[in-house]
Amino acid sequence: MTVLSTWLLLDFDEGLPKRLYQWGDQPDPFRLFDETELAGYSAQSPLLVRAEHNPRLLRAFNDEPDDWPGLLLVTPHPTALLLLHLRHILIIRFAGQRKGVLRYYSPRTASYFFSAQSGELATWFGPIQQLSWHGGTWRDEAEDTLGFHTMTNPEAPDWRPEANRQAFHIGSEHAEALQRQQAERFLYQWWSKNPVPSFNQAWNWLEEGRRFGLVSSDALSNNLDARCAHPDSNLPAAPPPTNEMERLEYLTTHLRQSVKDKERYS
């Protein structure tokens, strides 16, 4: 009979090590960054803790999840293989040879990355049979719909590490999920400071700005300010073939003029 083990992978904060020993009975944490390219940052590493050996800690994770951001993992594989995989998927490659760190242990990133509808998920899960976390996307945060999420991987019992391990390459669906995370984070920061009816409305304005050829955060933010000031105005049919700042000026001028025209003929 397969024996399952349960683990907590907790995102780092300054007080985490101390709290672990306050709440844990036998924390004995593994530092995720050890034996990886991030070993130089080991002091700020997420910590992996055996949940069955620390029932009070597991209860705290379930009862007060905002105080313990991280993942709950269930696996039929030994500790060494779980750690091997968790460390392996830390460093990822994008199109070309660009490398990055995948902060999958963050509930925010997990809500985008592991929720992407991709046939590659079993590869990313590897030895993990069940994955749970509390949180959600930036949109969920704005709409007050954060909660617990659980995903399963029926292929975990048959998983074996590759003999010649290569860096994981991000597929298009996962790349889009991470790009959406960045876009929603940018929008949430703007939306939380502005009197917009809904996050969804603000998202539509952001998408309009992108289609208009606005790319930089300053231009997109200025466009959002203009749309917020003139929410009922229509966009011009097409942007002029000029640089970004001229497109932004053309757009904001059109929005202001559209309001004046409506007032004139009302």
Language model features with spans:
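A contiguous, surface-oriented mixed alpha/beta subdomain in the mid-to-C-terminal portion of proteins
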Residues: 2-4, 19-35, 43, 48-49, ...
